[in-house]
Each structure stands twice: as C-alpha cells, then as structure tokens.
Regions:
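Glycine-rich phosphate-binding loops that contact phosphosugars or nucleotide phosphates
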Residues: 1-90, 99-103
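Short, amphipathic alpha-helical interaction segments embedded in low-complexity terminal/linker regions
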Residues: 99-158
Length: 158
C-alpha cells in the first residue's frame, strides 16, 4: 500500500493500454500504491478513474475521472471498512452493472451471461429460461444443461 511503484508492477501482467479503463480505489485518496498506479496508467494511455471519500485528495488530481463519496468521518477512526468501504462497494456495483448492460450481458433485467457455478445459480438460470421461453421447468433445465449458459439456451429457441 505504501509502495508507489508496486501498483503498476502488479498491473503489468494485464498489458494496460489505450483500450483499458483502470479505476483506483482509496478511501483516503492518498494511498501511494493507487496514486502511483493511476499515474502510470495515464502514461500508458488508459482511461483512469478513482473512487474515494476525500475531496481534493491526490487520487482525484491524478485520475481523469473522480467519483467522491462524501460520507463524513468513520464511527471508529481509521476503520474505512465501515462507511467509506461500503460507499465504495455500492459505487463499484453500479459501475459493474452498467458495464454488463453496455456489453449486452443483460436481457431485460436479467443477467444472461452469469456463471452457473452452483445449484442456486443453476436454478436461477433455469427459471430465466423457463420464463423467457414459456416452457416447463424441467425442459428449461434440460436446455440449460445442454447448452451450458442461459444465453445459449435462449438462443437455441430463438
């Protein structure tokens, strides 16, 4: 967290460039790891943003786009996992949801490209296929298992 170069080193395996967007997250807005990484991402031509809870902090000056959630002081001083962390997570959820919609991974209000990694998600996917196609649960489940994804199951009947 204190090493200004380590953030960029950690990003090297992703070959950051002009096609990328990098969002730095720092409750205080001054974390050297985040600030340094964003500076180097700017140099590489990436679009940069930040999410912080401290207006006018170093990270807001480095990022091309800043989101500042002014939540006030933490109830327990220094415990940024409380208000700051919660606010930042909500913002990240909004950003990731918007990205998934823009990428076409949502049909209507359903995430059709979800990973079917457990029984609960398989059931959810089956119900999506069932409702969208107007077929019985068992038929939808068979389609889902055959095609391996909600999107492919839906497209198989389009």
């Amino acid at each position: 967290e204190d090493d200004r170069e380590q953030g960029w080193k950690d990003l090297q395996e992703h070959s950051i460039g002009i096609e990328d967007t990098v969002i730095g997250i720092a409750a205080s807005g001054g974390t050297p790891y985040v600030v340094g990484a964003l500076e180097r991402c700017n140099d590489a031509g990436a679009l940069t943003g930040c999410i912080t809870c401290n207006p006018g902090s170093p990270v807001t000056r480095v990022a091309k786009h800043a989101i500042v959630a002014v939540v006030g002081p933490e109830y327990v001083t220094g415990s940024t996992r409380m208000k700051s962390g919660t606010a930042q997570k909500l913002i990240l959820n909004m950003i990731s949801t918007a990205v998934m919609i823009k990428l076409g991974r949502v049909k209507g209000n359903r995430m059709v490209d979800m990973q079917l990694s457990n029984n609960k998600l398989i059931d959810r996917g089956t119900r999506m296929v069932m409702e969208r196609l107007g077929i019985a649960y068992e038929v939808a489940n068979e389609l889902l298992r055959k095609h391996g994804s909600v999107r492919k199951a839906l497209e198989s009947r389009s």
